């Protein structure tokens, strides 16, 4: 789960990741490396308790993690000042992501590798006056005045994660699948 609080001067990203140890691995894991760059760590918890970790320039080592656990991380990032156009950045007043090949590590601490597949639920919080359209991967689950929640049920590597927030127009059509299911299609563009 990812929760973005988009702001003009900073963005707070909260992540909640459920880890399960591979049953074919029999030895205890002493440390787990999570990629992370250009992140200001606010908090990190394992199963609701302060985590033991070692911060590095390119990520952090989670020390002595349990076999199965829930990791909650909160970071501060600055998309408004990013010029490399990786991770979450701003362009023409809109928030955009570029996660391929290794940009997701500039959004939160994560196993930023193509062989790690995850299901993403993304909550985007923003001022709708400035960012009326809030998009992410998958299906729109819920939308309120200042929030949109998206769920993508298809497991995928984090380099395929996408988020866009801003003033956009769209063209819309629908498609009927061979099973008779109606699918809405939209193409978003700057006005």
How should these model regions be labeled?
Residues 1-191:
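Acidic/His-enriched low-complexity segments
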């Amino acid at each position: 789960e990812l929760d973005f609080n988009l702001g003009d001067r900073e963005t707070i990203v909260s992540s909640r990741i459920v880890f399960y140890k591979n049953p074919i691995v029999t030895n205890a894991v002493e440390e787990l490396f999570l990629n992370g760059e250009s992140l200001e760590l606010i908090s990190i918890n394992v199963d609701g308790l302060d985590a033991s970790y070692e911060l590095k320039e390119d990520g952090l080592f989670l020390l002595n993690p349990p076999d199965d656990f829930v990791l909650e991380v909160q970071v501060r990032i600055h998309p408004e000042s990013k010029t490399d156009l990786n991770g979450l950045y701003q362009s023409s007043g809109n928030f955009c992501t570029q996660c391929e090949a290794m940009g997701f590590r500039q959004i939160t601490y994560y196993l930023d590798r193509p062989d790690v597949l995850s299901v993403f639920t993304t909550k985007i919080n923003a001022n709708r006056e400035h960012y009326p359209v809030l998009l992410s991967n998958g299906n729109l689950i819920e939308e309120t005045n200042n929030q949109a929640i998206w769920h993508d049920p298809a497991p995928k590597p984090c380099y395929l994660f996408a988020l866009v927030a801003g003033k956009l127009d769209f063209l819309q059509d629908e498609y009927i699948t061979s099973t008779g299911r109606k699918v809405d299609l939209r193409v978003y563009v700057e006005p």
